[in-house]
Amino acid sequence: MALTSEQKKSILAEYGLHETDTGSPEAQIAMLTNRINTLTEHLKFHKHDHHSRRGLLLLVGRRRGLLKYLADNNVDRYRDLIARLGLRR
């Protein structure tokens, strides 16, 4: 399910570089993480929903690429972000 505008605003306020920041890797990764968590909860109840499972795998791959980009370009921002999001790496 897509994020509501209120959810996006709260995520961007917490993780973005400024209040209208949607392009920074931190903001994109935070929004993808929220969508991944939502889809994961959905799949716990709907185990046979393979279309959503494929969408989840695509989102995880997109987030992995953004995390790799951030780790290659700025390790300090990368470490700070994974600590704030609670991701394991």
From Swiss-Prot:
CDD domains, per the entry: Ribosomal_S15p_S13e
Record keywords: Ribonucleoprotein, Ribosomal protein, RNA-binding, rRNA-binding
Single annotated GO MF: rRNA binding
Top-rank lineage group of the source organism: Bacteria
One Pfam family named in its UniProt record: Ribosomal_S15
Record bears the keyword Ribosomal protein: yes
GO cellular component, one term: cytosolic small ribosomal subunit
Keyword RNA-binding: yes
GO biological process: translation
Subunit comment: Part of the 30S ribosomal subunit. Forms a bridge to the 50S subunit in the 70S ribosome, contacting the 23S rRNA.
UniProt-listed NCBIfam families: S15_bact
Protein family per UniProt: Belongs to the universal ribosomal protein uS15 family.
Role, per record: One of the primary rRNA binding proteins, it binds directly to 16S rRNA where it helps nucleate assembly of the platform of the 30S subunit by binding and bridging several RNA helices of the 16S rRNA.
Protein's name in the database: Small ribosomal subunit protein uS15
High-level lineage: Bacteria, Bacillati, Actinomycetota, Actinomycetes, Mycobacteriales
GN (gene name): rpsO
